[in-house]
Amino acid sequence: MTAPVIGVLALQGDVREHTAALAAAGADARPVRRPKELETVDGLVIPGGESTTISRLVDLFELREPIDKRIADGMPVYGSCAGMIMLASEVLDGRSDQRGFAGIEMTVRRNAFGRQIASFEAPVSMAGIDGDPLHVLFIRAPWVERVGRGVEVLGTVAEGPAAGRIVAVRQGNLLATSFHPELTDDRRLHAYFADLVRAAI
Protein backbone atom coordinates (compact mmCIF):
# COMPACT_ATOMS: atom_id res chain seq x y z
CA MET A 1 0.00 0.00 0.00
CA THR A 2 1.40 3.38 -1.02
CA ALA A 3 2.06 5.80 1.83
CA PRO A 4 0.27 9.10 1.18
CA VAL A 5 2.43 12.20 1.48
CA ILE A 6 0.81 14.45 4.09
CA GLY A 7 2.11 17.86 4.98
CA VAL A 8 1.71 19.54 8.36
CA LEU A 9 1.42 23.32 8.15
CA ALA A 10 4.49 24.20 10.19
CA LEU A 11 3.79 27.80 11.16
CA GLN A 12 2.55 27.23 14.72
CA GLY A 13 1.15 24.50 16.95
CA ASP A 14 1.83 20.80 17.49
CA VAL A 15 3.72 20.20 14.25
CA ARG A 16 6.06 17.53 15.63
CA GLU A 17 3.22 15.65 17.34
CA HIS A 18 1.03 15.63 14.22
CA THR A 19 3.99 14.52 12.10
CA ALA A 20 4.74 11.62 14.47
CA ALA A 21 1.06 10.59 14.62
CA LEU A 22 0.75 10.61 10.82
CA ALA A 23 3.94 8.56 10.45
CA ALA A 24 2.60 6.04 12.99
CA ALA A 25 -0.58 5.87 10.89
CA GLY A 26 1.40 4.91 7.78
CA ALA A 27 1.80 8.28 6.08
CA ASP A 28 4.92 9.99 4.73
CA ALA A 29 4.60 13.13 6.87
CA ARG A 30 6.58 16.33 6.35
CA PRO A 31 6.43 19.98 7.42
CA VAL A 32 5.07 22.60 5.02
CA ARG A 33 6.18 26.23 5.31
CA ARG A 34 6.52 27.30 1.67
CA PRO A 35 4.39 27.07 -1.48
CA LYS A 36 6.99 24.77 -3.09
CA GLU A 37 6.66 22.34 -0.17
CA LEU A 38 2.87 22.41 -0.50
CA GLU A 39 3.21 21.26 -4.11
CA THR A 40 4.82 17.98 -2.96
CA VAL A 41 2.00 16.77 -0.67
CA ASP A 42 -1.22 14.82 -1.24
CA GLY A 43 -2.95 16.17 1.88
CA LEU A 44 -2.44 18.80 4.57
CA VAL A 45 -2.95 19.08 8.34
CA ILE A 46 -3.57 22.50 9.86
CA PRO A 47 -2.63 22.08 13.53
CA GLY A 48 -3.89 23.88 16.59
CA GLY A 49 -2.37 27.09 17.87
CA GLU A 50 -3.83 30.59 17.74
CA SER A 51 -6.09 31.06 14.73
CA THR A 52 -5.50 34.80 14.31
CA THR A 53 -1.73 34.23 14.36
CA ILE A 54 -1.99 31.35 11.88
CA SER A 55 -4.07 33.60 9.61
CA ARG A 56 -1.32 36.26 9.63
CA LEU A 57 1.48 33.73 9.12
CA VAL A 58 -0.32 32.11 6.17
CA ASP A 59 -0.19 35.51 4.46
CA LEU A 60 3.38 36.21 5.55
CA PHE A 61 4.60 32.90 4.09
CA GLU A 62 2.53 33.44 0.92
CA LEU A 63 0.55 30.25 1.44
CA ARG A 64 -3.04 31.53 1.34
CA GLU A 65 -3.56 31.43 -2.42
CA PRO A 66 -1.76 28.09 -2.92
CA ILE A 67 -3.76 26.43 -0.12
CA ASP A 68 -7.04 27.91 -1.39
CA LYS A 69 -6.25 26.53 -4.85
CA ARG A 70 -5.32 23.06 -3.57
CA ILE A 71 -8.55 22.92 -1.52
CA ALA A 72 -10.55 23.95 -4.60
CA ASP A 73 -8.78 21.19 -6.55
CA GLY A 74 -9.87 18.59 -3.97
CA MET A 75 -6.79 18.14 -1.78
CA PRO A 76 -7.80 16.59 1.58
CA VAL A 77 -7.20 18.88 4.55
CA TYR A 78 -7.60 18.15 8.26
CA GLY A 79 -7.83 21.02 10.73
CA SER A 80 -7.60 20.49 14.51
CA CYS A 81 -8.70 23.17 16.99
CA ALA A 82 -7.41 26.41 15.39
CA GLY A 83 -7.25 24.42 12.15
CA MET A 84 -11.01 23.87 12.44
CA ILE A 85 -11.46 27.64 12.73
CA MET A 86 -9.29 28.15 9.64
CA LEU A 87 -11.54 25.79 7.64
CA ALA A 88 -14.85 27.34 8.76
CA SER A 89 -17.00 29.51 6.51
CA GLU A 90 -18.06 31.62 9.51
CA VAL A 91 -16.30 32.33 12.81
CA LEU A 92 -18.01 33.81 15.87
CA ASP A 93 -15.91 35.74 18.41
CA GLY A 94 -13.03 36.01 15.93
CA ARG A 95 -11.09 39.14 15.04
CA SER A 96 -12.26 41.31 12.17
CA ASP A 97 -8.94 40.89 10.33
CA GLN A 98 -8.93 37.10 10.73
CA ARG A 99 -9.23 35.17 7.46
CA GLY A 100 -9.49 31.44 6.95
CA PHE A 101 -9.98 29.16 3.97
CA ALA A 102 -13.79 28.84 4.33
CA GLY A 103 -13.73 25.28 3.00
CA ILE A 104 -16.39 23.78 5.30
CA GLU A 105 -19.88 25.28 5.39
CA MET A 106 -20.14 25.69 9.15
CA THR A 107 -20.26 28.29 11.89
CA VAL A 108 -17.75 27.82 14.71
CA ARG A 109 -17.40 29.74 17.95
CA ARG A 110 -13.78 30.54 18.72
CA ASN A 111 -12.56 29.61 22.25
CA ALA A 112 -16.07 28.34 23.03
CA PHE A 113 -14.91 25.79 25.61
CA GLY A 114 -12.22 28.10 27.00
CA ARG A 115 -14.55 30.63 28.55
CA GLN A 116 -16.64 28.02 30.31
CA ILE A 117 -14.62 24.99 31.24
CA ALA A 118 -11.10 25.72 30.00
CA SER A 119 -9.04 22.70 28.95
CA PHE A 120 -10.37 19.21 29.60
CA GLU A 121 -10.41 15.60 28.43
CA ALA A 122 -13.52 13.84 27.17
CA PRO A 123 -14.62 10.75 25.26
CA VAL A 124 -15.87 11.37 21.71
CA SER A 125 -17.51 8.69 19.58
CA MET A 126 -16.77 9.32 15.92
CA ALA A 127 -18.60 8.01 12.88
CA GLY A 128 -16.17 6.09 10.69
CA ILE A 129 -13.83 5.17 13.54
CA ASP A 130 -14.45 1.74 15.05
CA GLY A 131 -13.89 0.65 18.62
CA ASP A 132 -14.07 2.58 21.86
CA PRO A 133 -14.69 6.34 21.83
CA LEU A 134 -11.63 8.50 21.27
CA HIS A 135 -10.36 9.95 24.55
CA VAL A 136 -9.26 13.41 23.48
CA LEU A 137 -8.00 16.76 24.74
CA PHE A 138 -9.79 20.07 24.31
CA ILE A 139 -7.58 23.14 24.84
CA ARG A 140 -9.52 26.44 24.71
CA ALA A 141 -11.27 24.80 21.81
CA PRO A 142 -13.97 25.94 19.40
CA TRP A 143 -17.24 24.14 18.86
CA VAL A 144 -19.53 24.02 15.85
CA GLU A 145 -22.81 25.92 16.19
CA ARG A 146 -24.20 25.31 12.71
CA VAL A 147 -23.46 23.05 9.75
CA GLY A 148 -24.57 23.57 6.18
CA ARG A 149 -25.87 21.10 3.64
CA GLY A 150 -23.30 18.52 2.69
CA VAL A 151 -21.51 18.70 6.05
CA GLU A 152 -21.46 15.43 7.98
CA VAL A 153 -21.36 15.58 11.78
CA LEU A 154 -18.85 12.92 12.81
CA GLY A 155 -18.62 13.46 16.55
CA THR A 156 -20.15 15.19 19.55
CA VAL A 157 -19.13 15.49 23.19
CA ALA A 158 -20.63 12.48 24.98
CA GLU A 159 -20.95 13.79 28.55
CA GLY A 160 -20.43 16.70 30.92
CA PRO A 161 -21.47 20.36 30.62
CA ALA A 162 -20.72 20.42 26.88
CA ALA A 163 -22.60 17.19 26.07
CA GLY A 164 -24.05 17.23 22.58
CA ARG A 165 -21.77 19.94 21.22
CA ILE A 166 -20.50 19.21 17.71
CA VAL A 167 -16.73 18.72 17.74
CA ALA A 168 -15.94 16.78 14.55
CA VAL A 169 -17.21 17.31 11.00
CA ARG A 170 -16.42 16.39 7.43
CA GLN A 171 -17.35 17.95 4.12
CA GLY A 172 -16.02 16.04 1.15
CA ASN A 173 -12.24 15.81 1.56
CA LEU A 174 -12.15 18.33 4.40
CA LEU A 175 -12.07 17.11 8.01
CA ALA A 176 -12.11 19.22 11.17
CA THR A 177 -12.08 18.57 14.92
CA SER A 178 -12.25 20.85 17.95
CA PHE A 179 -9.84 18.62 19.82
CA HIS A 180 -6.17 17.61 19.69
CA PRO A 181 -5.79 13.90 18.78
CA GLU A 182 -2.04 14.36 18.31
CA LEU A 183 -1.59 14.80 22.08
CA THR A 184 -2.77 11.26 22.85
CA ASP A 185 -1.42 7.83 21.91
CA ASP A 186 -4.57 6.96 19.93
CA ARG A 187 -3.71 7.17 16.22
CA ARG A 188 -7.12 6.21 14.81
CA LEU A 189 -8.09 9.72 13.72
CA HIS A 190 -4.78 10.23 11.90
CA ALA A 191 -5.25 6.82 10.27
CA TYR A 192 -8.76 7.89 9.20
CA PHE A 193 -7.33 11.02 7.57
CA ALA A 194 -4.47 9.07 5.96
CA ASP A 195 -7.07 6.75 4.41
CA LEU A 196 -9.03 9.76 3.17
CA VAL A 197 -5.88 11.14 1.52
CA ARG A 198 -4.96 7.75 0.08
CA ALA A 199 -8.42 7.46 -1.52
CA ALA A 200 -8.05 10.90 -3.11
CA ILE A 201 -4.68 10.26 -4.77
Swiss-Prot record:
Positions of L-glutamine binding: 49-51, 110, 139-140
One GO CC term, this protein: glutaminase complex
EC number, UniProt record: 4.3.3.6, 3.5.1.2
Keyword NADP applies: no
Catalytic activity: aldehydo-D-ribose 5-phosphate + D-glyceraldehyde 3-phosphate + L-glutamine = pyridoxal 5'-phosphate + L-glutamate + phosphate + 3 H2O + H(+); L-glutamine + H2O = L-glutamate + NH4(+)
GO MF, one annotated term: pyridoxal 5'-phosphate synthase (glutamine hydrolysing) activity
Alphabetical GO biological process terms: glutamine catabolic process; pyridoxal phosphate biosynthetic process; pyridoxine metabolic process
CDD domains: GATase1_PB
Pfam families, sorted: SNO
PROSITE patterns named among the record's database cross-references: PDXT_SNO_1 (PS01236), PDXT_SNO_2 (PS51130)
Pathway stated in the Swiss-Prot or TrEMBL entry: Cofactor biosynthesis; pyridoxal 5'-phosphate biosynthesis
UniProt keyword terms in alphabetical order: Glutamine amidotransferase, Hydrolase, Lyase, Pyridoxal phosphate
Claim: Hydrolase is one of the keywords in the record: yes
Active-site residues (renumbered): 81 (nucleophile), 180 (charge relay system), 182 (charge relay system)
Subunit note: In the presence of PdxS, forms a dodecamer of heterodimers. Only shows activity in the heterodimer.
Task of the protein: Catalyzes the hydrolysis of glutamine to glutamate and ammonia as part of the biosynthesis of pyridoxal 5'-phosphate. The resulting ammonia molecule is channeled to the active site of PdxS.
Entry's family note: Belongs to the glutaminase PdxT/SNO family.
Name of the protein: Pyridoxal 5'-phosphate synthase subunit PdxT
The organism of origin for this protein: Salinispora tropica (strain ATCC BAA-916 / DSM 44818 / JCM 13857 / NBRC 105044 / CNB-440)
